Amino acid sequence: MSDSDLPVQVKKEPSFANDDDLTFDEEFRRAGDQENKEVENPDDGRSLKRTREESEQEENNEKEQDQEAGQDEEEQDEDEEEEEDDEEEDEEDEVSSRRKRRRGANQFFDIEAEVDDEEEDEEDEDEEAELMREEFITDDHAPVETVEKMPQDDRLHRQYDNRRQQAEDQDAEQLAETLKQRYRKTHSVYRGETAASGTVSQKLLMPSINDPSIYAIRCTPGREKELVRKLYEKKRTLERQGNPLDILTVFQRDAFTGYIYIEAKRPDAIDKALVGMVNVFVRDKLLVPVKEYPDLLKQVKSSDVEIRPGIYVRIKRGIYRGDLAIVDNLSENGLDVRCQVVPRLDYGQNDEIGPDGKVIKSKIKPLPALFSEQKARMYDPYKLQMGRVPNSFIYRGNEYYDGYLYKDFKLQFIQTKDVNPTLEELDRFQNQNDEDGLNLQAIAATLKGNNAGEGKSSTAFQPGDKVEIRRGEQAKTIGIVVETALNEITIKVTDSGDPRFVDQRLTVPANDLRKIFYEGDHVRIVEGKHFDETGLVIKIDGDSVVIVSDQTKEDVRVFANYLVKATDASSNFDLLNSKYDIKDLVELSGLTVGVIIKAEKNIFDVLTTDGRLISVRQSGIASKLKQSRREQVATDRNGTTIRVGDTVKELLGEKSREGAILHIYKNALFIKSNEIVENLGIFVANRMNVTTVATKDSTVSKSLGPDLTSMNPNLRLPNPVAVAGLKTRVGGRDKLLYKDVAVTSGSYKGLKGKVTEADDLYARIELHTKSKKIKVLKNNLNVIVHGQPVPYLRFIGAAPEFSQPTPPTYGSSSGGRSAWNGGMTPSVSAGNGGVSAWGGSRGGFGGDGGKTPAYGAGGASTWGGASAWGGGAGGSSAWGGIKGAGSVWDRSKGGSSASSGNQGGNTAWDRNKGGNSTWDRSKGGSSSWESGSTWEGGNNTTWGSKKGNTSAWGRN
């Protein structure tokens, strides 16, 4: 061991008189250093001694300066702050000088803190401790210049460590903001315009001519995905064999059927990759232009439904083409799908044997039905085998379990879009599904793909619906739908865990939302098996809701998103696709007829003619009754004609219901009332129990009594003075309505039409010749009756106007009689003193002369003393100038008839006395067609004249 390795023996020396500021350890350390240097180099010791003396002298000088400074402080208070600063600087210089002097003495010493009884400043202690930590280990062998620079290096390291510790303790968001502010300028300069826009121009992403090219290769439609998988497997296999293909990418696009796309640097690499591949046409290669790359490679959300067990699909090929199936499993290569199908079997019943003895299968497509073991054993037992598990069979090479066929189909023969299962198809799979008979999750997965392909939402969210976010960062957030767009729903937050989101709008995918309902809400089902049914919510179970159906009164479990709030119990039946509508008159059987008052999905509520309300299916309705206008006519209890649209009132016991007639079927009236709530306000009444309140075209007073016009025809004759304003609406409907008429005067003279409206003076006519309606005075119309025109006044039973001459049709009697005959009601009775028109007994309405209701008494005419058509006593006729009772057409005296020259009360066609027959010639009276002929003499008729009874046309 060398001397340098031995520990140095240090002896304690007494401290110098001026070393008051040095501690014992420092003095001990300085003494040891001095002895070592004296042994090695005495000159250095002397120099060290001189250096120590110089330092002591400097310290004494400093003390003297401090004393002087203290005296100056007492004398000059103004410079106190400056002197304190000087003292601090001097102390720092003194400490630094001490540090330099004892830099190399602590290499082999353990420095311990000394307990000082004196009270010192906390700042001094902290500073001393910091210095001790810095000087604990130093490099004594380093050069002096290096030793002098080390404090500065240590300070830099400490500053770096402090900054790093602060950065670690800093919050992540604050640190990100700091970095963003620090490097914002350089970031913007580097990115250029893209920093502001946030997007990169499509042209910057375009490949160059040095990049690989993309080729489109034509293939068999429907085989695109299969070819892509095969090329991928081929590339992996050849890579393992050390002969890799030079193609980079293989893909296909759903939007471009019949093509696959391969990315390669050379076309010959594509030819090599496609060697031995089927369903692909290698010669039909197309180089895709560079400008079409963005459209070709643009990411588009696939509309394909993920094929997984349980979803509904349809078969594209074979005997099961178009049939609904359920995916049971997938093959390992992903090219085959095992499906569950309802089998179509005839068990060989329709098979035929050909000339060669082979069985020819029938081309008739059997109906879908579950597999029947009994039929298979009965008709085709040799091809039936028992399966490996209970209730399974193998028939003709196919496996059947629980009556369903389980068969493998190629992936390209499976249709996953636009499946849309019907209710009848879903019922066939009811045996194995849940309590509702449907696999709701499978239907939801199927509908999700269908609606996504069409750009529609899979659920019916409407503005105002209350929803809850099911998953994501905002889960459990409740809001109200304010806007819907495709599969994105905008909601207004009403309740959230973070108050900052309240009243804010969020856009959420429709699949992440769930509708909120409460017990007691009345809802309608908009999707699923129970579509369009209504019910009352009785239970909420997660995403599903249990309701009581209004139609079946049974519990139904459906998804909450399949419901909407309903205001009524009736369903929105698809009337556009139905043969029957509400309020239609239908026939259920030969004896039952009724009106539809409610239409459900498959059930109609019908109110029958006997007042019963029955529910029938659409198949239970025989036909819809289409009655003509003529058939829907009846009479009420007063004999007034009633039609569809008239307002009637039922008078039966205490009932007093009123309404408009909706349908008329025989004696039953279906009446719609605004005062009744049940059955849409429709009730049934018998026609004999109602009275007319108002017709469709006019109003009848409710205080009308019995219809006297039907009892006494005499009341139909109006006052001649009031003929111009004659009212024809006696007892309800205007008699002229819906009659064919002809115009007799005016600019429309000769035109014919049908009366559609009428008032007291005018009638509105719809012309037959052209589609036009005209307004004409009723007096200018002729009514067409049995093909013959009848003047309007005669049609309504009124007398003709007196300003116009009208020749008599038959004859007249003596004075004091009516216009047609004495003592007789017009056109009813005739004869002398109430004799019937045909002779004999009295008429029911006849009487003596002067008793006609519409005219004056005493035999005097309205215009004179004589009758209008005959010559009575006491005055001349209106058309005759003969004194006495001369007839208009006759000049004989007395009461001769207009058509005869006989006396007294002879009939129009007879000249005998008394009530002789018209065709009798007894008692000197000749018949109208006998001895008194028109061209003969004697007691002649109207066309002959003799002995005073001269005819108007002859003078024989």
Swiss-Prot record:
One of its GO terms (molecular function) is mRNA binding. One of its GO terms (cellular component) is DSIF complex. Residues 1-156, 805-835, 886-956 are annotated as: Disordered. Residues 924-938 have a biased composition (Low complexity). It is found in: Nucleus. Residues 26-66, 130-156 have a biased composition (Basic and acidic residues). Keywords: mRNA processing, Nucleus, Transcription. Residues 67-94, 111-129 have a biased composition (Acidic residues). It comes from the Eukaryota. GO terms for biological process: cellular response to starvation; filamentous growth; filamentous growth of a population of unicellular organisms in response to biotic stimulus; filamentous growth of a population of unicellular organisms in response to starvation; filamentous growth of a unicellular organism; intracellular mRNA localization; negative regulation of transcription elongation by RNA polymerase I; positive regulation of autophagy. Pfam families: KOW, KOW1_SPT5, KOW2_Spt5, KOW4_SPT5, KOW5_SPT5, KOWx_SPT5, Spt5-NGN, Spt5_N. Its main location: nucleus. Residues 939-956 have a biased composition (Polar residues). SUPFAM superfamilies: Translation proteins SH3-like domain (SSF50104). Belongs to the SPT5 family. Component of the SPT4-SPT5 complex. Interacts with RNA polymerase II. The SPT4-SPT5 complex mediates both activation and inhibition of transcription elongation, and plays a role in pre-mRNA processing. This complex seems to be important for the stability of the RNA polymerase II elongation machinery on the chromatin template but not for the inherent ability of this machinery to translocate down the gene. This is Transcription elongation factor SPT5. It comes from Candida albicans (strain SC5314 / ATCC MYA-2876) (Yeast).
